[in-house]
Amino acid sequence: MTVITRFAPSPTGKLHIGNVRVALVNWLYAQKYNGNFILRIDDTDRDRSKVEYHEAIIKDLQWLGINWNSSFLQSTRFNKYAAAKQYLISSGRLYECYETPEMLEIERKRQLASGYPPIYSRKSLELTTAQKVQLQAEGYKVHYRFLIDRNKPIIWNDLIKGEIKYDGSNVSDPIVIKEDGTMIYMLCSVIDDIEYRISHIIRGEDHITNTAIQIQMFEALGAAIPQLGHLSLIKSDSGKISKRIGGFTIDYLKDQLGIEPMAVNNLLALSGTSNNVDAYFSLESLITKFDLSAFSKSTIIYNENELVTLNHKLLVNTEYDTIKHRLTAIGLPDVTKEFWLAVRHNLNTLNDIKIWWQICYLPTLDKFQEQDAEFLKLAAELLPSGKLTDNSWDDWVQNIIKATNRRGKALFMPLRLALTGITYGPELKYLLPLIGGDEVRARLLRYQ
């Protein structure tokens, strides 16, 4: 059997780390078993689906390195859905309903008040043809529900959670075709999964109830049921993650936070598994590590600091030739290999390099302790002449110690503040050659 997985986002908002994790896991599973990965755009919601969100989904997935063997939009397949609709009507699994949302809400409240679960009463099944004609004449619009077999337990062996059971009598018949004739996601998805021979459906555990219903839809359409797996959800410290809450979207991580794509991939592929979350440099490494059985059933708490730490590890170990084109893209085409090697250990994101470029070549230095003025003047006098190298620092420091008897923080901190304006950063021995002898001397003497 060929493994075929899919990712089916709705173009109603931007991708966030929760749904990207689903995409990544499905992609990794397909790659692990030499299968195919399909991108399906669930755009049947005509009011909320936007072209710009569709384009953003494509862009974000490509940025992460997730590619697909084929792609399609559900909005191009209405003829297929219409044929399935007629089949299900003729087989008695779709039936007409005429209740308004207000009527359904009254029924729901009545059931809850009586201590019953809000399960649709199936009153519409009792309507005669004449009654349906009368309702239509009175302006009531038809919608369709899928008839759940309530005498049959729904059971599947989940790839992540193990055996899951649903009592069919506790499942309400879902509306699958709206009053405007639009078929909703739940049934469209099953029709597509059948035609595209999806072998494994892996998605968030918030879809478990949908899965129970869709199992009966597969059976009603005479199709085999794919392997099913449900990932635990990702939550933030403050609660739910969604496309409508800021701070979790891929464009925020990429454009505002400055995160590398592999930092996102590492965190989402390895969090909530028995594997350590480490900084792998390629998706190929993650494919090798990938094991669906390693995924935990517990909720994952997303921590942005953990993502930034992974990002730092990646940058620290990134070679200059690999990053050079990216430096040009962010407006720093003149960064040399020496500069990159000097500052990369102090970068949490690539954009941080702009701070050190500013410090070395476009300084605005205002931090200085007045009592250190004479010390800095002496340090300037002791600075080696000629071009500074990595070795210049050690010679310079030894001469300063001999002349002032200063050591440790009392020696290094005034120099760091005078030369960089901040109390932390790359080793000064590597910054000196970058700043240059004349500029180092000028910075030391500017306080005289």
UniProtKB/Swiss-Prot annotation:
**Which PROSITE patterns does the annotation name?**
AA_TRNA_LIGASE_I (PS00178)
The record's EC number reads: 6.1.1.17
Primary location recorded for the protein, binned into one broad class: cytoplasm
According to its UniProt record, where is this protein located? Cytoplasm
> Catalyzes what?
tRNA(Glu) + L-glutamate + ATP = L-glutamyl-tRNA(Glu) + AMP + diphosphate
According to the UniProt entry, its GO molecular function terms are:
ATP binding; glutamate-tRNA ligase activity; tRNA binding
Map motif 'HIGH' region onto the chain.
Answer: 9-19
Could you name the Gene Ontology cellular component terms for this entry? cytoplasm
Q: Which UniProt keywords apply?
A: Aminoacyl-tRNA synthetase, ATP-binding, Cytoplasm, Ligase, Nucleotide-binding, Protein biosynthesis
Motif, 'KMSKS' region: chain positions: 240-244
Q: Which GO terms describe its biological process?
A: glutamyl-tRNA aminoacylation
Annotated binding of ATP, by residue: K243
Superkingdom to which the source organism belongs: Bacteria
PANTHER family of this UniProt entry? GLUTAMATE--TRNA LIGASE, GLUTAMATE--TRNA LIGASE, MITOCHONDRIAL-RELATED
Q: Which HAMAP family does this one have? A: Glu_tRNA_synth_type1
Instruction: Tell me the function of this protein.
Output: Catalyzes the attachment of glutamate to tRNA(Glu) in a two-step reaction: glutamate is first activated by ATP to form Glu-AMP and then transferred to the acceptor end of tRNA(Glu).
By sequence similarity, the record places it as follows: Belongs to the class-I aminoacyl-tRNA synthetase family. Glutamate--tRNA ligase type 1 subfamily.
Assembly and binders: Monomer.
Q: What is this protein called?
A: Glutamate--tRNA ligase 1
